[in-house]
């Protein structure tokens, strides 16, 4: 048996031996023979879930069983090696995944590109980017925790990018695991048409194997690390349940799939292939979610999950990817990109992640159309800059393997390309083609930051420049009012991790100030303006008059700013309208009540006046400044604050204390549920009231409670909160005397 044959057909022990022999034979890795598969033999998948559901451990097992790594390490293992996919030192220390690591592997002659994504809410943008470029995903759920807040976030993101998914209920070996409850939560909370395609043979410490409902066989994982798979008859005590669950699976599938539905109604017999074909069709259409079970830590259920990835998730040719051709004054024209791996069409790729590596900036891309070879020239669609490809690499966590060419469907990386995440690259700069950009949420928390030593300022600047380029949710700016340098992001943990990375990677220890909330200011009702800007001081003067109305946008758009030109005729010449918009957007950076940005406002320019000599774009910009100051005085304003979705889980005996604390923090409780001595409460709480909650929860639940929160929306503040914010702002500006309250004896 040749080495290559042994690799493609042999079991994993043979495969590992073959890999070692190939290494001696001078191959860099199995990149050389997994490089160019036909499109049917490629899968681009992501592994997404709530924090601590076991994503990274599952990826580690997948890499081991597919022969990609020779030994396994745990996320917080005793050997201190850490998981392969957690390449950053900070990730291994904390046992969480911060960046989404990319790798690829081979299973049954199919090339699988895997992106392991973070589960912590503060790193949502990493998940967004990963899902944008994937064709399918594995949603990992904890058999104890079930559907948690971040699971719902990931589910929403999958819906946004239309990503088909398999569900894998992990951690069957944990005390209190209940996969049946998790399935009912998937149906009720996530609205998934879901059913088991596998059942566990025992749970907790009694977890022996799984039942495959499609093949009607029991699967046992034996030998060292569960590498030997033994098929057997379904245990006697599980046959009735297996038949019932198989019938339930067929009913759910028949509701979602026409072909199987007809067979079901005509009461014709089903074959295993009929069910598999229906599962594939419905999974790709997102009308059904197959649910698999297992425990990655105890090496059970991982190989059948890999088989399901090949059987039910789409290849790049089965997913429609659209490009948009921009045309002036028209809606962009949609173009379906050709996924064929033949290089006939021009190359189109999307940069979905940036990383500063040892050799300069590393840019992760997904190729959607055509072929890219070493030495080719490509153009950035946003900047029109030309880039020559000196080196193409494929990634295995933080190790690189050089390749000569990549085709549609491949995930790869380039060096030294100056771009931002979400940029489109093409070989033809004239076609104005771009992919839809990646959705980036607005930051909600800001903190003052300063280096501890003045000599570290250079390193501090380098770190800030790198991190803001890599992560679009991490912002950096200087506040002139308080003369402080501020960073803003998706949460306290997000900013703390960057502070620690500055110290570790750049030798620049920094001090973070207290967290500050990103409030917004908006109008309560419409306010008209008619403003004349006139300045004459010898020579040509300035003259501009604008008339219109500023009005609030609907609540679901209260983070946006809109500008509408409703002028008719030439009272306001069209070349001066951009000046009005520029003036409006400049003034929107700082409100009157609390100095925060304006949002949720539409500026309607309806009429005005100009002077044949004295009018200019600058004059109209200054007129917009004056008009908005007029609206500040005459309009009715309110402050908006970010509201967070909070999920708290704790033992039942602390339910009263937890609910009381949330109510005290102005929380609105939206739901509760209890199970086996534990309860979960869902609430909407203003972010401003959530600081310090972690410590309070720990002390009130004897350290047993835990909570997660994620941004939901902006909503008006309570009147007393607004008064307090306005007063604090006025005091900081020296506009009001601080309250001198009498001290109580």
UniProtKB/Swiss-Prot annotation:
Keywords: Elongation factor, GTP-binding, Mitochondrion, Nucleotide-binding, Protein biosynthesis. Gene3D superfamilies: 3.30.230.10, 3.30.70.240, Elongation Factor G (Translational Gtpase), domain 3 (3.30.70.870), P-loop containing nucleotide triphosphate hydrolases (3.40.50.300), Translation factors (2.40.30.10). The keyword Plastid does not apply. GTP binds at residues 49-56, 116-120, 170-173. It comes from the Eukaryota. InterPro entries: EFG_II, EFG_III, EFG_III/V, EFG_IV, EFG_V, EFG_V-like, EFTu-like_2, G_TR_CS. Pathway: Protein biosynthesis; polypeptide chain elongation. GO terms for cellular component: mitochondrion; nucleus. Pfam families: EFG_C, EFG_III, EFG_IV, GTP_EFTU, GTP_EFTU_D2. SUPFAM superfamilies: EF-G C-terminal domain-like (SSF54980), P-loop containing nucleoside triphosphate hydrolases (SSF52540), Ribosomal protein S5 domain 2-like (SSF54211), Translation proteins (SSF50447). Its main location: mitochondrion. GO terms for molecular function: GTP binding; GTPase activity; translation elongation factor activity. HAMAP family: EF_G_EF_2_B. Mitochondrial GTPase that catalyzes the GTP-dependent ribosomal translocation step during translation elongation. During this step, the ribosome changes from the pre-translocational (PRE) to the post-translocational (POST) state as the newly formed A-site-bound peptidyl-tRNA and P-site-bound deacylated tRNA move to the P and E sites, respectively. Catalyzes the coordinated movement of the two tRNA molecules, the mRNA and conformational changes in the ribosome. This protein may be expected to contain an N-terminal transit peptide but none has been predicted. This is Elongation factor G, mitochondrial. The lineage of its organism: Eukaryota, Metazoa, Ecdysozoa, Arthropoda, Hexapoda.
């Amino acid at each position: 048996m040749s080495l290559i044959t042994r690799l493609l057909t042999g079991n994993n022990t043979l495969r590992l031996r073959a890999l070692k022999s190939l290494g001696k034979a001078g191959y860099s890795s199995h990149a050389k023979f997994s490089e160019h598969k036909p499109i049917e033999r490629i899968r681009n998948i992501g592994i997404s879930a709530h924090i601590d559901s076991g994503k990274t451990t599952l990826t580690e097992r997948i890499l081991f069983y597919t022969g990609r790594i020779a030994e396994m390490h745990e996320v917080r293992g005793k050997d201190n090696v850490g998981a392969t996919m957690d390449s950053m030192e900070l990730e291994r220390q904390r046992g969480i995944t911060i960046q989404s690591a990319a790798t690829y592997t081979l299973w049954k002659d199919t090339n699988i590109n895997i992106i392991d994504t973070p589960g912590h809410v503060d790193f949502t943008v990493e998940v967004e980017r990963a899902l944008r470029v994937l064709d399918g995903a594995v949603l990992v759920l904890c058999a104890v925790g079930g559907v948690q807040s971040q699971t719902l976030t990931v589910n929403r993101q999958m819906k946004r990018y239309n990503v088909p998914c398999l569900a894998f209920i992990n951690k069957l070996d944990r005390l209190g695991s209940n996969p049946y409850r998790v399935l009912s939560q998937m149906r009720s909370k996530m609205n998934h048409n879901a059913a088991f395609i596998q059942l566990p043979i025992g749970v907790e410490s009694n977890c022996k194997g799984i039942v495959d409902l499609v093949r009607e066989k029991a699967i046992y994982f034996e030998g060292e690390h569960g590498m030997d798979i033994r098929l057997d008859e379904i245990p006697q005590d599980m046959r009735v349940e297996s038949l019932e669950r198989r019938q339930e699976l067929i009913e759910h599938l028949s509701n979602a799939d026409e072909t199987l539905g007809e067979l079901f109604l005509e009461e014709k017999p089903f074959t295993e292939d009929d069910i598999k074909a229906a599962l594939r069709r419905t999974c790709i259409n997102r009308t059904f979610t197959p649910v698999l079970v297992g425990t990655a830590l105890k090496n059970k259920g991982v190989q059948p999950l890999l088989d399901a990835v090949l059987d039910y998730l789409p290849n790049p040719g089965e997913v429609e990817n659209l490009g948009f051709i921009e045309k002036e004054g028209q809606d962009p024209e949609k173009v379906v990109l050709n996924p064929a791996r033949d290089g006939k069409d021009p190359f189109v790729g999307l940069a979905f992640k940036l990383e500063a590596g040892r050799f300069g900036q590393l840019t992760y891309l997904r190729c959607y159309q055509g072929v890219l070879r070493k030495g080719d020239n490509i153009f950035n669609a946003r900047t029109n800059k030309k880039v020559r490809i000196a080196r193409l690499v494929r990634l295995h966590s933080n190790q690189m393997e050089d390749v000569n060419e990549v085709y549609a469907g491949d995930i790869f990386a380039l060096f030294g390309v100056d771009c931002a995440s979400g940029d489109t690259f093409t070989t033809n700069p004239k076609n104005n083609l771009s992919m839809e950009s990646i959705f980036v949420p607005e930051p909600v928390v800001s903190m003052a930051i300063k280096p501890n030593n003045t000599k570290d300022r250079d390193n501090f600047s380098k770190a800030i420049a790198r991190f803001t380029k890599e992560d679009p949710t991490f912002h950096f700016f200087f506040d002139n009012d308080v003369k402080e340098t501020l960073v803003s992001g998706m949460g306290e943990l997000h900013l703390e991790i960057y502070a620690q990375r500055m110290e570790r990677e750049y030798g620049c220890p920094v001090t973070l100030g207290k967290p500050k909330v990103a409030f917004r200011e908006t109008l309560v009702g419409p306010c008209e303006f008619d403003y004349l800007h006139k300045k004459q001081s010898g020579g040509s003067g300035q003259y501009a008059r604008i008339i219109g109305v500023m009005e609030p946008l609907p609540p679901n758009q209260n983070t946006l700013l809109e500008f509408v030109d409703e002028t008719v005729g030439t009272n306001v010449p069209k070349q001066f309208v951009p000046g009005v918009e520029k003036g409006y957007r400049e003034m929107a950076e700082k409100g009157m009540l609390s100095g925060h940005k304006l949002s949720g406002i539409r500026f309607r320019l309806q009429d005005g006046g100009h002077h044949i000599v004295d009018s200019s774009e600058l004059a109209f910009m200054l007129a917009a400044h004056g008009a908005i100051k007029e609206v500040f005085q005459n309009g009715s304003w309110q402050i908006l604050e970010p509201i967070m979705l909070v999920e708290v889980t704790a033992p039942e005996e602390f339910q009263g204390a937890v609910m009381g604390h949330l109510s005290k923090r102005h929380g609105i409780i939206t739901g509760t549920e209890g199970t086996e001595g534990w309860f979960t409460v869902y609430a909407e709480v203003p972010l401003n009231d959530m600081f310090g909650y972690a410590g309070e929860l720990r002390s009130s639940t004897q350290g047993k409670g835990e909570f997660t929160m994620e941004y939901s929306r902006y909503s008006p503040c309570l009147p007393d909160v607004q008064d307090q914010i306005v007063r604090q702002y006025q005091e900081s500006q020296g506009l009001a005397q601080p309250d001198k309250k009498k001290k109580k004896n």
